[in-house]
Amino acid sequence: MIEVALGAGLGASVRYLITQVLKSKTRVFPWATFIINITGALLLGFLHSKITSSHILLLLGTGFLGGYTTFSTFQVELVTLVNNRKQKMMIIYLLLTVICGILAAYCGSWLGKL
């Protein structure tokens, strides 16, 4: 349990820093959340193919990547785009995130098997 808590705190802190850096550079498309969720999918795919230790998976997978990635922010950003009458951008964001997330997880899994 301590592995999850430590990893989650660190993952959330890294996510916050990345969001702050990218926040001022983006306007409409939520790049920070997109990049965070896609890199998280890639890393989780890699970990699940490469790591066999349950403690390391708890620390890095469930903990760090659980704190690093953010499904709830993704949902709120979709709703915000709709509320701001940016339906096309919402659809693009939704599709890109789902498709790229699946591809990233697959690539991470493939890389982990090398």
Swiss-Prot record:
Na(+) is not transported, but it plays an essential structural role and its presence is essential for fluoride channel function. One of its GO terms (molecular function) is fluoride channel activity. Its main location: membrane. The keyword Transport applies. One of its GO terms (biological process) is cellular detoxification of fluoride. InterPro entries: FluC. GO terms for cellular component: plasma membrane. It catalyses: fluoride(in) = fluoride(out). Na(+) binds at G66, T69. It is a multi-pass membrane protein. It is found in: Cell membrane. Keywords: Cell membrane, Ion channel, Ion transport, Membrane, Metal-binding, Sodium, Transmembrane, Transmembrane helix, Transport. The chain crosses the membrane at residues 28-48, 56-76, 91-111. It comes from the Bacteria. Signal peptide: none annotated. Fluoride-specific ion channel. Important for reducing fluoride concentration in the cell, thus reducing its toxicity. Belongs to the fluoride channel Fluc/FEX (TC 1.A.43) family. This is Fluoride-specific ion channel FluC 1. It comes from Ligilactobacillus salivarius (strain UCC118). The lineage of its organism: Bacteria, Bacillati, Bacillota, Bacilli, Lactobacillales.
